């Protein structure tokens, strides 16, 4: 066997005072039977393998490009054994799914249009510095392995994460550095023929520290700052693309001839355009989505019937051409007349509605509507021990704020599968979570696990941004003290030549059809002061800076309008629901934790059983006590304090105790965990109507609750008790006890 021919190239990204990051690409050693394979390294201690493979035969019955991106997180990469029952990795976690989406979004548009062969890119995380995010390295590795594969691919695509730290945009920041970042942004793009970088995808968010950093005087991530971050990412993207090209020039396979299946031929398009364009233009002015869709469906059926004989066997082409004509009609109306599908102006927002408390008994609920998009937000609060436990390669091991997004088929008037979330739903939930994370209270300020569910009740454009609005309302109604309300809006862009001039038109609050027919999907969420999350996907080779600035300005204006409407529904946290748990926080010495827990959990379980409260103990001695009513939580707090922060009991103090043991000379009564006293048989007369008591069991039994008072404490701390009865009986018994002893 001959030695493999290994080729490699590396590039060093300079972050100035923050040091350098070295990215290395290598091919020829691993996965040699894949069409293209690349090993990518970041600073020699993080290693990914990306392998691209194409199916041998096209799926000509598909009307889409069958591209699959898979990310495999190997736990050995971090020196861990999986925590599952079978100790295997199992299904991909949320981080892996989100990384798949990050790769798919910029890669998919770069394949040749009409390709129908199945293409699969598998990225395996093989070694990982726990302080290093691997997602942007995976974008570059997937791009390069695809370039080497011989597929018709117009890459390379470069991806970089830049974070705003101490006023500087830092490339490939570590998790430690991100703790001091104001804004975190993943940007992907490619180098154009002019040498400029065309941005294809952006995924960005403020951090959990942003609010405090801004309050301490750090520059807030405003729209202008975010636009500057996009420019700062371009040199790094260009550098990574050049490194990919250098290796591809040495190791890439020749581009193979793959059959291309165009959606339609020109003759079909011309016939469809002549037959239906005028009527389609009228149909696309119908404001109501359902009526508009019904009319376009009618027109499509008419065209199929009219042209079916002329183009026999080419019905799929007629359908595709119909969609293309529809797209052209919508775009021309926007570019020429500045009029949109539903008759709105370019910056107009659809009618807004917001209300809270729409579901009984739940801890918080809200309904947010923007036109035909309708989102239900529901908040649930619980003890911190109910926060999500994560067994992934990420340093995040538990998640206090969980945000789930559900998109049922009825939200678009269709039937379909319900159940486990698809990748799109995972992505939308993650986007809404990132938008709200910077304004959530800390664990110390609000010691609750928070689960937010966003349900799309109706969909016609940007349910993800609607989820942000509905969630803000529901959280406030649940009593969560947000630092500021957050709203989101989806922007669009249409470009084209009109009378020989290239025009760009930014659209506010896009419909579903405008999203499909436009050139950009741009979602922006934030407070009144700054941006908290941003997501951008574009089909263009580049967006001029002034066009992007205009879109950001329109988004800010729309966001402020939406926040005003939300404030009319609720503008500050309400009182917590009577059905939500009440949580009390206390701190005990660390060396007392064992005493509170007791042998095999005996003491803590007894406190929980006696009071009905739930208790969670942190390693630092912080104890969270939760109960559905304040009395139970207070009783549990007193019981814990009696053990961990004890005060010596005094004669005359009264307790509601529990009989834990009976003997022939009396009953032992537990006043609190770890503190018992003796109720002598002679003191039971008052409970027996003043009669002599021959057997303790005739008066009290184990488990019985009894009100007692401390009559005496001896030198060894032993407690003598007397029962408390109505009137002054307890006091007379105490006096009688003293006279008998005399």
From Swiss-Prot:
EC number from the UniProt entry: 2.7.7.8
Alphabetized SUPFAM superfamilies for the sequence: Eukaryotic type KH-domain (KH-domain type I), Nucleic acid-binding proteins, Polynucleotide phosphorylase/guanosine pentaphosphate synthase (PNPase/GPSI), domain 3, Ribonuclease PH domain 2-like, Ribosomal protein S5 domain 2-like
Gene Ontology BP annotations: mRNA catabolic process; RNA processing
Cellular component annotations (GO), alphabetically ordered: cytosol
Keywords: Cytoplasm, Magnesium, Metal-binding, Nucleotidyltransferase, RNA-binding, Transferase
InterPro entries, alphabetized: ExoRNase_PH_dom1, ExoRNase_PH_dom2, ExoRNase_PH_dom2_sf, GPSI/PNP, KH_dom, KH_dom_type_1, KH_dom_type_1_sf, NA-bd_OB-fold
Superkingdom as given in the UniProt entry: Bacteria
Residue ranges constituting the KH domain according to the UniProt record: 581-640
Pfam family, one: KH_1
Cofactors demanded by this protein: Mg(2+)
Reaction(s) catalysed by this chain's protein: RNA(n+1) + phosphate = RNA(n) + a ribonucleoside 5'-diphosphate
Family: Belongs to the polyribonucleotide nucleotidyltransferase family.
Stated role: Involved in mRNA degradation. Catalyzes the phosphorolysis of single-stranded polyribonucleotides processively in the 3'- to 5'-direction.
Protein name: Polyribonucleotide nucleotidyltransferase
High-level lineage: Bacteria, Bacillati, Actinomycetota, Actinomycetes, Propionibacteriales
Chain's gene name: pnp
């Amino acid at each position: 066997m001959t030695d493999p021919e290994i080729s490699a190239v590396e590039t060093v990204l300079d972050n100035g005072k923050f040091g350098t990051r070295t990215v290395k690409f290598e091919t020829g050693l691993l996965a040699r039977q894949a069409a293209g394979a690349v090993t990518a390294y970041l600073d020699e201690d993080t290693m990914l393998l990306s392998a691209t493979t194409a199916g041998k035969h096209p799926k000509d019955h598909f009307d889409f490009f069958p591209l699959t991106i898979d990310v495999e997180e190997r736990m050995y990469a971090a020196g861990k054994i999986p925590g599952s029952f079978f100790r295997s990795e199992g299904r991909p976690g949320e981080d892996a799914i989100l990384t798949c989406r990050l790769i798919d979004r910029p890669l998919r548009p770069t394949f040749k249009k009409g390709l129908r062969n199945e293409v699969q890119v598998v990225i395996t995380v093989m070694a990982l510095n726990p302080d290093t995010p691997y997602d942007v390295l995976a974008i570059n590795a997937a791009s390069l392995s695809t370039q080497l594969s011989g597929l018709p691919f117009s890459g390379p695509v470069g991806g970089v994460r830049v974070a705003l730290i101490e006023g500087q945009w830092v490339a490939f920041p570590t998790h430690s550095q991100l703790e001091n970042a104001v804004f975190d942004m993943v940007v992907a793009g490619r180098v154009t023929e002019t040498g400029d970088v065309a941005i294809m995808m952006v995924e960005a968010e403020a951090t959990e520290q942003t609010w405090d950093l801004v309050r301490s005087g750090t520059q807030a991530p405003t729209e202008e700052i975010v636009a500057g971050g996009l420019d700062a990412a371009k040199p790094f993207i260009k550098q990574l693309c050049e490194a990919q090209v250098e290796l591809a020039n040495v190791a890439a396979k020749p581009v193979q001839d793959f059959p291309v299946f165009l959606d339609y031929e020109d003759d079909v398009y011309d016939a469809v355009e002549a037959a239906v364009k005028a009527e389609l233009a009228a149909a696309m002015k119908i404001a109501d989505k359902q009526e508009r869709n019904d009319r376009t469906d009618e027109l499509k059926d008419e065209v199929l019937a009219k042209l079916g004989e002329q183009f026999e066997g080419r019905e799929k082409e007629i359908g595709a051409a119909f969609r293309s004509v529809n797209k052209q009609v919508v775009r021309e109306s926007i570019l020429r007349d500045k009029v949109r599908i539903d008759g709105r102006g370019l910056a107009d927002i659809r009618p807004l509605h917001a209300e809270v408390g729409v579901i009984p008994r739940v801890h918080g609920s809200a309904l947010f509507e923007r036109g035909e998009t309708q989102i239900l937000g529901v908040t649930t609060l619980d003890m911190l021990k109910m926060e999500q436990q994560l067994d992934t390669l990420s340093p995040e091991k538990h998640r206090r704020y969980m945000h789930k997004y559900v998109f049922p088929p009825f939200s678009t008037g269709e039937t379909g599968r319900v159940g486990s979330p698809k990748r799109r739903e995972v992505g939308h939930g993650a986007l809404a979570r990132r938008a709200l994370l910077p304004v959530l209270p800390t664990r110390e300020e609000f010691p609750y696990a928070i689960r937010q569910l966003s349900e799309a009740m109706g969909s016609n454009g940007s349910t993800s941004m609607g989820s942000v609005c509905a969630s803000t309302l529901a959280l406030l109604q649940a009593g969560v003290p947000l630092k500021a309300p957050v709203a989101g809006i989806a922007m669009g862009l249409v470009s084209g030549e009109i009378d020989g001039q290239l025009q760009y038109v930014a659209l506010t609050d896009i419909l579903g059809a405008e999203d499909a027919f436009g050139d950009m999907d741009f979602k922006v969420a934030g407070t009144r002061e700054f941006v908290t999350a941003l997501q951008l996907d574009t089909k263009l080779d580049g967006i001029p800076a002034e066009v992007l600035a205009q879109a950001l300005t329109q988004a800010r204006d729309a966001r402020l309008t939406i926040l005003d409407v939300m404030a009319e529904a609720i503008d500050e946290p309400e009182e917590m629901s009577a059905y939500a748990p009440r949580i009390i926080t206390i701190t005990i010495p660390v060396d007392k934790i064992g005493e509170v827990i007791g042998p095999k959990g005996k003491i803590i379980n007894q406190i929980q059983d006696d009071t009905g409260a739930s208790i969670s103990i942190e390693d630092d001695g912080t104890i969270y006590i939760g109960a559905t009513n304040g009395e139970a939580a207070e009783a549990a707090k007193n019981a814990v304090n009696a053990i961990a922060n004890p005060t010596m009991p005094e004669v005359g103090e009264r307790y509601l105790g529990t009989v834990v043991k009976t003997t022939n000379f009396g009953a032992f009564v537990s006043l609190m965990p770890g503190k018992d006293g003796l109720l002598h048989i002679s003191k039971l007369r008052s409970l027996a109507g003043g009669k002599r008591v021959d057997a303790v069991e005739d008066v009290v039994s184990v488990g019985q609750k009894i009100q007692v008072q401390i009559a005496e404490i001896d030198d060894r701390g032993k407690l003598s008790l007397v029962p408390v009865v109505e009137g002054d009986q307890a006091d007379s018994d105490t006096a009688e006890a003293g006279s008998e002893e005399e």
